[in-house]
Amino acid sequence: MHTLAKSEDPAVEKGAPWGLARISHRDSLTFGTFNKYLYSSDGGEGVDVYVIDTGTNVDHVDFEGRASWGKTIPSGDEDKDGNGHGTHCSGTVAGKKYGVAKKAHVKAVKVLRSNGSGSMSDVVKGVEYAAESHIEQVEKAKKGKRKGFKGSAANMSLGGGKSALLDQAVNAAVDAGIHFAVAAGNDNADSCRYSPAAAEKAVTVGASTLADERAYFSNFGKCNDIFAPGLNILSTWIGSETATNVISGTSMASPHIAGLLAYLLSLQPSKNSAYAVAEITPKKLKADLLSIATVGALEDVPSDTANVSNSIFPCFRSVLTQIRSSPGTVVVLPTTPRSSPPVATRSRTRSASTVLRISRLSPRPTLPTRPTRRSRRWMLRSSVRT
């Protein structure tokens, strides 16, 4: 890692969504910090982020022209996000106001139709497209046709029953050099029973709340790598170039991590390698991400789940020094939950359905005691509050 090019002092976004504030403060948020995001103004520069979802409202002003359409996978569908889910995730990754990595470039990969449904084969094709596109960009950079390219990250805020095919596709994309974040799922269950949450080479992300608790719906277990803000998240939306919406889910947590991966990748020195222009591999950056995360900050985390959340020091010199000296691993002591739901111990077979659908938890003024049990279908990992 290297120090910041322009200044060691972070920029401060006032009036930021609470999720951005949380990832830039080690301690719990206070009245004075709950809406302040500390960041590098160059964060994400030179990095492509593939948002594999329902598409992206690429004309939204918050993207400042940094969002483009990659590919529409479903046959006969339009190059447009008619749902909003993908646009919301993209905004959290790279929006000027709502995003973690404010200079990253979003590439929309539409794998689900506007109603949120689609085939598992289309999702796999979307992952394969992202990997192939990344490899093409690496070759362009090595030939001097794309200067400043640092590499690629990806976000996948969808999932369903265990699918070896999808897990293999995601792991292969990571092997190709993409730094991948995936949602853990919203079933309040063991994330190892779902895909792509079980893809071991990706970063699997659970959802946390403003009160530093595991979100009541968030999956948990040994396949979880980290938690990130996922309840009542404000970001970009469809319908106009300025539309916004507040929604919840591990869908919202995962793009915080995808954005942070892009952010950290952009701080790497440019150097050709088998993975990307930045030499660091996805495996090493994942280890670095975990090494600078906060351990033991969350309540209601089952004892078999890593109590790790993506909060970092606002002092960027400290962060970069930690990454330089990181051994690449992190030891996490199990935390006894204050009042967490029991960890599932009974094995249950789930068929990997070929249909993906949106998972919408009922809008509510207060949190229910437990989420609605979902059928064996693939789904987007969000709920909508309008």
Where are these regions (language model features)?
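Autoinhibitory propeptides
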Residues: 1-20
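Acidic-leg catalytic submotif of subtilisin-like serine proteases
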Residues: 21-77, 154
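Substrate-binding/access-modulating region of protease and related hydrolase catalytic domains
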Residues: 43-44, 96, 111-201, 211-216, ...
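Structural recognition of the beta-strand scaffold that forms the well-ordered cores
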Residues: 48-52, 105-110, 152-157, 179-183, ...
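Catalytic-core environment of secreted peptidases
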Residues: 52, 57-63, 67-70, 80, ...
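Flexible, small-residue-rich helix->loop connector segments that border functional cores
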Residues: 52-62, 87-105, 109, 128-147, ...
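Hydrolase catalytic cores
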Residues: 90-93, 105-113, 128, 216, ...
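Cationic, amphipathic, low-complexity alpha-helical segments enriched
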Residues: 312, 319-323, 329-386
